[in-house]
From Swiss-Prot:
This is Large ribosomal subunit protein bL34. The keyword RNA-binding does not apply. One of its GO terms (biological process) is translation. HAMAP family: Ribosomal_bL34. The lineage of its organism: Bacteria, Bacillati, Bacillota, Bacilli, Bacillales. It holds the Pfam family Ribosomal_L34.
């Protein structure tokens, strides 16, 4: 079996980065929830 986690910083940013979150309504909801919770880091 191939490993399921293949680290790739570009893919990581594209999928989970701040601008990726801001691009959609649901992504903005995620950021708002993390701000509400008081997370130190909002995104990767």
């Amino acid at each position: 079996m191939k490993p399921t986690f293949n680290p790739n910083n570009r893919k990581r940013k594209k999928v989970h980065g701040f601008r990726a979150r801001m691009a959609t309504k649901n992504g903005r909801n995620i950021l708002a929830a993390r701000r509400r919770k008081g997370r130190k880091a909002l995104t990767v």
